[in-house]
UniProtKB/Swiss-Prot annotation:
Subcellular location: Endoplasmic reticulum membrane
Membrane topology: Multi-pass membrane protein
Methyltransferase in keyword set: yes
PANTHER family assigned: PHOSPHATIDYLETHANOLAMINE N-METHYLTRANSFERASE
Topological domains annotated Lumenal: 2-55, 108-187, 234-258, 311-362, 411-439, 485-534
Organism field: Saccharomyces cerevisiae (strain JAY291) (Baker's yeast)
Major localization listed first in the record, in broad terms: endoplasmic reticulum
Keyword Transcription regulation attributed: no
Catalytically driven reaction(s): a 1,2-diacyl-sn-glycero-3-phosphoethanolamine + S-adenosyl-L-methionine = a 1,2-diacyl-sn-glycero-3-phospho-N-methylethanolamine + S-adenosyl-L-homocysteine + H(+)
GO cellular component, one term: endoplasmic reticulum membrane
Cytoplasmic side: 77-86, 209-212, 280-291, 384-389, 461-463, 556-869
Gene3D superfamilies per UniProt: 1.20.120.1630, 2.60.40.2840
Protein name (Swiss-Prot/TrEMBL): Phosphatidylethanolamine N-methyltransferase
Record-stated family: Belongs to the class VI-like SAM-binding methyltransferase superfamily. CHO2 family.
Length: 869
C-alpha cells in the first residue's frame, strides 16, 4: 500500500469509483507512455472468489494459506501447544520480515532505479520476440547457456501467469512493461501479506486462554470493538484507494486521478499503518498475554519503519513533501523572529525524553535540565523513604497551581496584553517578554510531567507484584501515542504555535488563517484529545490506582478548560470565528445515525436559546410601564441635588467662594492654575483663615467640618499669615482688601499646590487655624493633559514643556525634587493618560529620568501594542 503527502492512499489513489466504471488514465514513470489500466480485484476476491479466473500462483497461494491450518493441527497433535505457538511465531516473524524488509528493498530499488521494470525490459519478459532472437542482440540464437534458459522460462511463466489471470480481451503486448510487472509483483505481495496475516492469527488463536471466565470480560469486549473497527478501516480504505494504492502502484506507473479525501483517510494520518493495526491490540486484549502484545507491537513498529524508510521517501520524490504556504506560516514566523532579533534563539523544548534547542549559553536551559536531573536523582536515591501520599499531594498541587499561573498569564495576555506590557513598561522588548514566557511554559510542562513520571514510577515499583504486564505495555503505548501527538502538533504549528505565539506576537502574523495541515487535518484540538492519553496510560500502568485516576482527571480538566475558555476565544478573536470541521468530524457526520443525533442536538440548542431570549424580553417588560423619560429625569434630579449640596455657602450676602470663570470652565487641564475669589463678612474673618483643596469623594461625608488632611494643598488668605510655612503662601495670595462690611481676596493655586491626579475637587474655606468649614466651592474637575503623540518628536516636545512648567525637569532629566506633588507616579500617569502606556518606576530610574529616552520608549511601546491589536 502506498502513500502521497501522508500516504498515496490519501492523494493520488483516492479515487472512490471503481476503475472499471470510469476512464482512468495512467502513464509510465520514465517514458511517459499513457494507457488505460485494466480492471483488477482486491486480494481476497482474487484468491478466493470462484467466479474469477485464477492463475497458477494464485492457486498455489490459496493452497499455502489453507495448508497452514492443517499444519497447525498436525504439529499441535505431535508436539503440543507450546511448540506449535513458537512454530507459528517464527513463521510470522519470517513473513513480517519478508514484508517489511523484503518488499521494502524491492520497492526501494524500484523507486530509485525502476529495477523490476528495467529487468523486464532487458530480458524482454513481456515481449513477443525474446532478445536472443533479436538481430541486435548479443546472445547467440543457438546458445544453451543456463542464463538464456532461465530467462526464457521466466518469460514464458510470467506471460502464462498474466494470461491465465486476466480476461481474454486483455492484450499482454499492448500494455507497457510497467503494468505487467506490477501484475506479477502483486502475486508475491498476496503470498507474503496473506501468510503474514494467517500465521499471526494462528499464533494468537493458540494464545487465547481456555477458561471462559478469562475470555468474557471487559477486555474482550473492547478487543472485539477494536477488531471490528479495524475491519471497517481496511474495507473503507480499499473502497477509497482501490488496488492501485493498495499494491504500491505508483512505484511502477502513475495514475491521473482527482484528489478525493474520504472516509477513513479523514480520521488518521497513514490510516492503514496507524489505526489499521488496532486489531492487533484488540486481539492482544482478548488473549490477555503480554507476549502476544509484544509481538503485535513488533509487527506494528516494523510497519512504521517500512513507512518511514520506503514509502515516505518515494512520495516526497514523486509528489513533493505536500506542504503549502499555509502550513509553513508558523515556521516562517519563527525564522522572521530570529532574523529581526539577533539576540533571539530558539527556545528549549522537551519532547518525550529529549530536549531540543539546548543553548549552552542560556542559563534557563541549565536550570530546566538541572531541575529534571535533581528530581530524578532524588527520587532514585530516596525511593524507599518517599511517602507516596505526600508525593501525590505535591504532584496535584504543583499541577493545579502552575496551571492556574499559566492560564492567568494567557487569559490576561489575551484580554489586555498584560504580560507584554509588564516587560515593555520595564524597558524590555516584546520579543524578550515572549522568550520569558517560553521558559515559563516549557518549565511548567517539564516540572509537572517529571513529577508525574516519578510518582508513577514509584507507584509501579512499590506495587510491582500486582502490576499486569499487558496493562503496563498498553500504558507505555499510550505514553508513546501522546509523545507522537506532541511531536506532530509541534511539526504542524512550529515553535510559534507550540508556545502560543499568537497571544504574544500577533503582529508577526501575516495571514489570518488557521493551519489544517498535519495532525490538524484530522483533529481541531489534538492536545485536548491525544494530549492527555499518556497520563491515562499511567492509570493502566498502576493497575487503576485511585490517585493516578485523580491526576489523570486533573490533567484532562485543565487541558479542556484551557482550550475551551482561553485558547478558543482568543483564536476566534485573532483568526475570526470560523467553524472548522475536522476530518474526524466530517467522517462521523457522514454516518447517518450520528448526523441525525447532531441535528436533534442543534434543534434542542436553538429551542433553549429562543426560550432564554423570550424570557429576557419578558423580564424587561416592566420597564416599559414607566414613563418614557423616567430614568433620564431621575438622573437629572440626582445631579441637581448634588449641585445644591455642593454650594454650601451661608445665607449671608457677603459669604462667597467662587472659581474664576466657573461658568465657562469647569475642567482645568494641568498645568493651568486655578484662581479662587473669596469674600467674608468682616466680623467673621480671621487672619488665620485658610483655603484647602480636596477630592470631593474624600470630603462629601461631612459638610461642616473637614476630617481629612489637605496634604499640603492649601493656602492662607493673607500674605501675613503662616509666615513659618514658607513663601509659597505669599505667592498664592494675589489680592486681599477690606471694607467696612467684608474682606475679599484672590488666591491662585498653581502647579505647586494642585493635585496631579484626574478627579473632581472642591475648595473649602476654613475658619481660623481650624478645620471648621465656612464656605465650599462648586465642584470642578482637574485633569492631566493629553500630549501630542503623532510622532515621537512631538511627544517628547510636549512632555518636556509640561515638565518644565511643573518645575521637575533639569538638564533634560526628570527631577521630582522640584515639585513635591509631581513624583514618579504622576509622571507615569501623565504618560499613560496621553499615550495609553505605563512605564515602570524602576525603568525610569534606570534611564536616570531622561525625557528623551522615556518619551521615545513610551512611543515605541505604543506602536508595538497597536500592532498587537
Amino acid at each position: 500500500m502506498s502513500s502521497c503527502k501522508t500516504t498515496l492512499s490519501e492523494m493520488v489513489g483516492s479515487v472512490t469509483k471503481d476503475r472499471g466504471t470510469i476512464n482512468v488514465k495512467a502513464r509510465t514513470r520514465s517514458s511517459n507512455v499513457t494507457f488505460k489500466p485494466p480492471v483488477t480485484h482486491d486480494m481476497v476476491r482474487s484468491l478466493f472468489d470462484p467466479t474469477l479466473k485464477k492463475s497458477l500462483l494464485e492457486k498455489c497461494i490459496a493452497l499455502a494459506i489453507i495448508s497452514n491450518f492443517f499444519i497447525c493441527y498436525w504439529v499441535f497433535q505431535r508436539f503440543g501447544l507450546q511448540f506449535t505457538k513458537y512454530f507459528f511465531l517464527v513463521q510470522y516473524l519470517f513473513w513480517r520480515i519478508a514484508y517489511n524488509l523484503g518488499i521494502g528493498l524491492v520497492l526501494h530499488y524500484q523507486s530509485h532505479y525502476e529495477t523490476l521494470t528495467n529487468c523486464a525490459k532487458t530480458h524482454a519478459i513481456f515481449s513477443k520476440i525474446p532478445h536472443n532472437k533479436d538481430a541486435n542482440s548479443n546472445f547467440s540464437t543457438n546458445s544453451n547457456s543456463f542464463s538464456e534458459k532461465f530467462w526464457n522460462f521466466i518469460r514464458k511463466f510470467c506471460q502464462y501467469e498474466i494470461r491465465s489471470k486476466m480476461p481474454k480481451e486483455y492484450d499482454l503486448f499492448a500494455y507497457p512493461e510497467e503494468i505487467n510487472v506490477w501484475l506479477i509483483f502483486r502475486q508475491f505481495v498476496d503470498l507474503i501479506l496473506m501468510q503474514d496475516f494467517v500465521t499471526y492469527i494462528i499464533y494468537v488463536y493458540l494464545s487465547i486462554p481456555y477458561s471462559w471466565v478469562q475470555i468474557f470480560n471487559w477486555r474482550s469486549l473492547l478487543g472485539v470493538i477494536l477488531i471490528l473497527f479495524n475491519i471497517w478501516v481496511k474495507l473503507d480504505a480499499h473502497r477509497v484507494v482501490k488496488d492501485y494504492a493498495w499494491y504500491w502502484g505508483d512505484f511502477f506507473f502513475l495514475e491521473e486521478s482527482e484528489l478525493i479525501f474520504d472516509g477513513v483517510f479523514n480520521i488518521s494520518p497513514h490510516p492503514m499503518y496507524s489505526i489499521g493495526y488496532l486489531g492487533y491490540y484488540g486481539l492482544s486484549l482478548i488473549c490477555n498475554d503480554y507476549k502476544v502484545l509484544l509481538v503485535s507491537v513488533f509487527g506494528h513498529y516494523s510497519q512504521f519503519l517500512f513507512l518511514k524508510y520506503v514509502e515516505n521517501p518515494h512520495i516526497e520524490r514523486t509528489y513533493g513533501d505536500g506542504t503549502d504556504s499555509d502550513s509553513q506560516m508558523n515556521s516562517r514566523i519563527d525564522d522572521l523572529i530570529s532574523k529581526e532579533n539577533y539576540d533571539y534563539s530558539r527556545p528549549l523544548i522537551n519532547m518525550g525524553l529529549s530536549f531540543n534547542n539546548f543553548n549552552k549559553l542560556r542559563f534557563t536551559d541549565y536550570f530546566t535540565i538541572g531541575t529534571v536531573a535533581a528530581l530524578m536523582l532524588g527520587a532514585i536515591m530516596n525511593a524507599r523513604f518517599i511517602n507516596l501520599n505526600y508525593l501525590f499531594i505535591t504532584v496535584f498541587v504543583t499541577k493545579l497551581v502552575s496551571w492556574l499561573f499559566i492560564s492567568t498569564i494567557l487569559y490576561k495576555q489575551s484580554q489586555s496584553k498584560w504580560f507584554t506590557r509588564l516587560f515593555l513598561e520595564n524597558g524590555y522588548t516584546q520579543v524578550y517578554s515572549y522568550e520569558q514566557w517560553q521558559f515559563i511554559y516549557n518549565y511548567y510542562l517539564v516540572l509537572t510531567y517529571t513529577l508525574m513520571i516519578i510518582y508513577t514510577g514509584l507507584q509501579i515499583w512499590s506495587n510491582f507484584s500486582n502490576i499486569n504486564n499487558s496493562q503496563l505495555i498498553f500504558g507505555l503505548i499510550l505514553v508513546a501515542l501522546q509523545t507522537w501527538c506532541d511531536k506532530e502538533t509541534r511539526l504542524a504549528i512550529s515553535d510559534f504555535g507550540w508556545f502560543y505565539g499568537d497571544f504574544f506576537l500577533s503582529n508577526y502574523i501575516s495571514t489570518r488563517k488557521l493551519t489544517s495541515q498535519g495532525i490538524y487535518r484530522y483533529l481541531n484540538h489534538p492536545e485536548a484529545v491525544l494530549g492527555v492519553v499518556g497520563v491515562w496510560g499511567t492509570v493502566l500502568m498502576t493497575n487503576f490506582a485511585v490517585t493516578n485516576i485523580i491526576l489523570a482527571v486533573l490533567w484532562t480538566l485543565t487541558n479542556f478548560i484551557l482550550v475551551k475558555f482561553i485558547e478558543t476565544p482568543h483564536v476566534n478573536k485573532i483568526y475570526g470565528k470560523t467553524k472548522r470541521v475536522s476530518g474526524v468530524g466530517k467522517t462521523l457526520l457522514g454516518l447517518k445515525p450520528l448526523r441525525q443525533v447532531s441535528d436533534i442536538v442543534n434543534r434542542i440548542e436553538n429551542i433553549i436559546i429562543k426560550s432564554l431570549v423570550d424570557e429576557s424580553k419578558n423580564s424587561n417588560g416592566g420597564a416599559e410601564l414607566l414613563p418614557k423619560n423616567y430614568q433620564d429625569n431621575k438622573e437629572w434630579n440626582i445631579l441637581i441635588q448634588e449641585a445644591m449640596d455642593s454650594v454650601a455657602t451661608r445665607l449671608s450676602p457677603y459669604c462667597e467662594l467662587k472659581i474664576e470663570n466657573e461658568q465657562i470652565e469647569t475642567n482645568f487641564v494641568l498645568p493651568t492654575p486655578v484662581t479662587l475669589n473669596w469674600k467674608m463678612p468682616i466680623e467673621l474673618y480671621n487672619g488665620d483663615d485658610w483655603i484647602g483643596l480636596y477630592k470631593v469623594i474624600d470630603t462629601r461625608a461631612d459638610r461642616e467640618k473637614t476630617r481629612v488632611g489637605s496634604g499640603g494643598h492649601w493656602s492662607a488668605t493673607s500674605k501675613d499669615s503662616y509666615m513659618n510655612h514658607g513663601l509659597r503662601h505669599k505667592e498664592s495670595v494675589t489680592e486681599i482688601k477690606a471694607t467696612e462690611k467684608y474682606v475679599q481676596g484672590k488666591v491662585t493655586f498653581d502647579t505647586s499646590l494642585l493635585y496631579f491626579e484626574n478627579g473632581i475637587y472642591e475648595f473649602r474655606y476654613h475658619s481660623g487655624n481650624s478645620h471648621k468649614v465656612l464656605l465650599i466651592s462648586t465642584p470642578f474637575e482637574i485633569s492631566l493633559p493629553v500630549l501630542n503623540t503623532t510622532t515621537p518628536e512631538l511627544f517628547e516636545k510636549d512632555l518636556t514643556e509640561f515638565l518644565t512648567k511643573v518645575n521637575v525637569l533639569k538638564d533634560g532629566k526628570f527631577r521630582p525634587l522640584g515639585n513635591k506633588f509631581f513624583g514618579m507616579d504622576s509622571l507615569k500617569q501623565l504618560i499613560k493618560n496621553s499615550i495609553g502606556v505605563e512605564l515602570s518606576s524602576e525603568y525610569m530610574r534606570r534611564v536616570n529620568g531622561d525625557a528623551h529616552v522615556i518619551s521615545h520608549r513610551a512611543w515605541d511601546i505604543k506602536q508595538t501594542l497597536d500592532s498587537l491589536a
